[in-house]
């Protein structure tokens, strides 16, 4: 079983070792800083491909009209909008995020587009969700799990609030599978991305952290094992774009 950072007392914040109790605050500062430029951040990190990844992530999810869905680390609401299209007028999407700034941006964007009915917004910590057991037919988290301090706790909470028969899905930057591409990817991540962050968002440090956080995230097989330890069955993953990102899925049976 992977070690909880609360057991060891320290965890990583990018490539830095920090006290586990401090990581949530540090991550919060990063996302408060980038909230208004979050879509730009994803465009810079993925060269714009994140939009296709997200569409595929939702299109292949186990969800049907009338379902109730929780989207964690919901950010600016782009995944929530796609999920609402899947669940229809009879369904509901709860957009959860620990960061009030991100949640506010998401709420404002959806409201300005006239997307009000069927959406709820909850500021919540993925490690201790404020929902009863078996509340949702589908639980998703995209580009958020790597920023959680205690990932094992978050996966257990996703399992707890999922209904029997439901699916949990994780979309996250992962480990590149092609050896020839790794130097190119590293160069973009550590040399180009922070400079782009400084140029377009006046915030090189946050973009440096985000690049580092990807390298510290568990690789594909490790995360699959963590999902199994959290209780999920039929765990599997699919690499996209050569492993730059991966979609992990598990079921509550």
Swiss-Prot record:
| Group of enzyme by EC | transferase
* Catalyzed chemical reaction(s): a 2-demethylmenaquinol + S-adenosyl-L-methionine = a menaquinol + S-adenosyl-L-homocysteine + H(+); a 2-methoxy-6-(all-trans-polyprenyl)benzene-1,4-diol + S-adenosyl-L-methionine = a 5-methoxy-2-methyl-3-(all-trans-polyprenyl)benzene-1,4-diol + S-adenosyl-L-homocysteine + H(+)
Which GO molecular function annotation, any one, does this entry have? 2-methoxy-6-polyprenyl-1,4-benzoquinol methyltransferase activity
Its Enzyme Commission number(s) read 2.1.1.163, 2.1.1.201
Write out the pathway annotation from the protein's UniProt entry: Quinol/quinone metabolism; menaquinone biosynthesis; menaquinol from 1,4-dihydroxy-2-naphthoate: step 2/2; Cofactor biosynthesis; ubiquinone biosynthesis
Query: Disulfide pairs?
Result: none
Q: Which GO terms describe its biological process?
A: aerobic respiration; menaquinone biosynthetic process; methylation; ubiquinone biosynthetic process
Keywords of this entry: Menaquinone biosynthesis, Methyltransferase, S-adenosyl-L-methionine, Transferase, Ubiquinone biosynthesis
Matches recorded under InterPro entries: SAM-dependent_MTases_sf (IPR029063), UbiE/COQ5_MeTrFase (IPR004033), UbiE/COQ5_MeTrFase_CS (IPR023576)
Q: Tell me its family.
A: Belongs to the class I-like SAM-binding methyltransferase superfamily. MenG/UbiE family.
What does this chain do? Methyltransferase required for the conversion of demethylmenaquinol (DMKH2) to menaquinol (MKH2) and the conversion of 2-polyprenyl-6-methoxy-1,4-benzoquinol (DDMQH2) to 2-polyprenyl-3-methyl-6-methoxy-1,4-benzoquinol (DMQH2).
What NCBIfam families has UniProt attached to this entry? Answer: MenG_MenH_UbiE, PRK00216.1-3, PRK00216.1-5
Q: What is this protein called?
A: Ubiquinone/menaquinone biosynthesis C-methyltransferase UbiE
* Protein's organism: Xanthomonas campestris pv. campestris (strain ATCC 33913 / DSM 3586 / NCPPB 528 / LMG 568 / P 25)
- Gene name tied to this protein: ubiE
